[in-house]
């Protein structure tokens, strides 16, 4: 009768442990194993760890190569990769460790020592990198202080206040310019109104001048008529005197002959009456002409005086408006030149401070990129260090598992069958507190290679029993 196949499972994986036994079923517990056989020691230095045991069943190390590689996970850190696999084989049916078993144990210890030495070297390298990072931070202390841009914020705030003040000053200047433009437009409208009034007055003066010319012509005509009447009067007087003389001479040389006839009219009286009438008519015409001329002259003088005063007032106002417009134009030109200078100064200031801000932003981006790279390196180092810690913890768990297996299988010293085992352990994170380790034992009875019976048992590693 032979036993075949028992398995130890942790988590969800169930590796198999197979072997043959010639004795009947029995229960192997840790309390039944003598202290001498269960004694073992784990000792180590910072560079190595050794596991020693006075005896170790060959069933544990027969097929260890296929499962230890999964129990000891491969890891890479800092460009170095490590993988662990160990194989043990038993010579014959001896359950005690022979020469090959000791060599396998030594090989395992050497591999474990090498692995832990690599872990220690990586830890040393990690410490060196951390020291270099701290030294770099100490060297870059001034650079890290430059990352405090609070004083730049104050300068930027002052510059923004200056820019705002310049904008307000520009707004006030623009408002003054607009007010000056409105005042200039108002004065221009007044000037246009006065210009229209002036043109109207000049047109009236031109019309009055035409009237004056007409009156002058009429006066000249009347004077000429008066002169003609005077000449006619003188001619009439002269002709009258001549007629009188002729009549007197005729009367003196004739004989008076009285004839009973109607009395003759007195021509002198008639001529005198005619002369008086002409004189009265001429005097009347002269007085009427003089009165009309005086009246028209007074009206014309009054109109000319009022027009002259209005024209003088208009000229004065025009001169004042012209001077005001010239002053406003000069002020407008000065304000425009000041505006151009302020705009150029503002553009220069904005360009200069935009360049400064761009340089500061580039420095900030560079420092942030350096900080991101350093943070990424630190996170990478931390993650790799965490992986190493996990590997170390798993390795310690593996050592604990080896210790348990050494304690559990130390009593199997009288079996002559060949037993091969495969131990596998899942990569369960150490930080998972809810993982329960269970052991399932499968016992098969075979006769001539045929399975007669098969039994399965489950329990924790401390409760493992063999039947």
From Swiss-Prot:
Keywords: Coiled coil, Intermediate filament, Keratin. GO terms for biological process: epithelial cell differentiation; intermediate filament organization. Residues 12-30 have a biased composition (Low complexity). Residues 12-32, 409-430 are annotated as: Disordered. Residues 138-156 are annotated as: Linker 1. Residues 249-268 are annotated as: Linker 12. SUPFAM superfamilies: Intermediate filament protein, coiled coil region (SSF64593). InterPro entries: IF_conserved (IPR018039), IF_rod_dom (IPR039008), Keratin_I (IPR002957). Residues 157-248 are annotated as: Coil 1B. Residues 417-463 are annotated as: Tail. Residues 101-413 form the IF rod domain. Expressed in the outermost cell layers of skin epidermis (at protein level). The keyword Coiled coil applies. Pfam families: Filament. Residues 269-416 are annotated as: Coil 2. One of its GO terms (molecular function) is structural molecule activity. Residues 101-137 are annotated as: Coil 1A. Residues 1-100 are annotated as: Head. It comes from the Eukaryota. GO terms for cellular component: cytoplasm; cytoskeleton; intermediate filament. Belongs to the intermediate filament family. There are two types of cytoskeletal and microfibrillar keratin, I (acidic) and II (neutral to basic) (40-55 and 56-70 kDa, respectively). Heterotetramer of two type I and two type II keratins. This is Keratin, type 1 cytoskeletal 11. The lineage of its organism: Eukaryota, Metazoa, Chordata, Craniata, Vertebrata.
